[in-house]
Amino acid sequence: MMTEKLNSGHTNLTSKGIINDLQIAGNTSDDMGWKSKLKLPPKDNRFKTTDVTDTRGNEFEEFCLKRELLMGIFEKGWERPSPIQEAAIPIALSGKDVLARAKNGTGKTGAYCIPVLEQIDPTKDYIQALVMVPTRELALQTSQICIELAKHLDIRVMVTTGGTILKDDILRIYQKVQLIIATPGRILDLMDKKVADMSHCRILVLDEADKLLSLDFQGMLDHVILKLPKDPQILLFSATFPLTVKNFMEKHLREPYEINLMEELTLKGVTQYYAFVQERQKVHCLNTLFSKLQINQSIIFCNSTQRVELLAKKITELGYCCYYIHAKMAQAHRNRVFHDFRQGLCRNLVCSDLFTRGIDVQAVNVVINFDFPRMAETYLHRIGRSGRFGHLGIAINLITYEDRFDLHRIEKELGTEIKPIPKVIDPALYVANVGASVGDTCNNSDLNNSANEEGNVSK
């Protein structure tokens, strides 16, 4: 009888063990199989520089993120964390304040979007996090990234900027959003009108913090912080750290974890050139560059809104597809241009410095400073529109006699090398799949033989 009971017990134990083993095997299979069901974008096989590949080898799974968030990350095409993501995500997830310096185009947006989305509770119908950015275009871009990352999470994301109808924003914010991406003026307006209830907002992100703390937004961030709960978690990201950022840090951040990945300021994948030209030769030089370079997409910078429109008209007259964008345009028009250029509907975009902050168009491989900037910071952000996320690109500066001192000063301030444009620009420096013929190389002699071409753009 005892033997039968023991055998019966053994049989039950064995059966339970088999069932447990099968359940574990099923769970393991499920753990391994969810990735195979993802709708992944085509793999990006382009060469990447150490700006984004010099990591410790961590995987996104090691951050213990929700599976739904991981699904969004992988379906976005992000395979492994970049250095700034690897450094910032685990610290931000711990609840500490973060002060992060990293180059443009190395994954800063993901470095704060991922921990913010992970910490939001989808079951709570109130604003839990606020991301502030300096421009409307950057707000739209950031909100789109958050929406894509959160596609499998039940998190409601809202973008609010100036230039749009305030009534529409008020109606949307009453639909119980949990994450807001905003420009300073508009979110302050919503707070002052008692529409945006920030009493439960525990996370504040400041992207492009040096710009947010400039004279353009003087004092706005202090007003925003006054309307948040006491001691919110602050994640502060910037490529440059002027005195205003340091003062803000000392005033509002609590023992922040400092990350500095700025051993050098310029992206390793961007090769910089200059060409000495007369003002009246610039359009002809631009025409030469268009005809000789293998341009995927290009951004051409001018120093004033008037020159932006005039140059865009000249380029169109030369027979090239060209959009333009600047701060004085209607917001709806700006949104359309920004969207269509990102979709690749036009190869060339002429713009003012509106387009220098954080804007990510990965197809851009050529940046041209039609007008050379006066400030090193502006130059740094302009050329950072090419060579995004470790890819290759070139920056070409058209330098007049009056620009020569600014050229040498900026080169010295940034600790970088801006080379004279060579007789031949090697396509391997900026073309993903090099298949260049002789006609695809750019001759500096062509640039210098432009004295007979007027092509003048009035100031």
Swiss-Prot record:
One of the GO biological process terms: deadenylation-dependent decapping of nuclear-transcribed mRNA
Effect annotated for changing residue 292 to A: Abolishes interaction with Edc3
Principal location class:
cytoplasm
The answer to whether UniProt assigns keyword Ubl conjugation to this entry is: no
Q: Name one GO molecular function term.
A: RNA binding
Please give the residue ranges the record annotates as the region Gyf binding: 264-431
* Entry keyword set: ATP-binding, Cell projection, Cytoplasm, Endoplasmic reticulum, Helicase, Hydrolase, Methylation, Nucleotide-binding, Phosphoprotein, Repressor, RNA-binding, Translation regulation
- What's the protein here called? ATP-dependent RNA helicase me31b
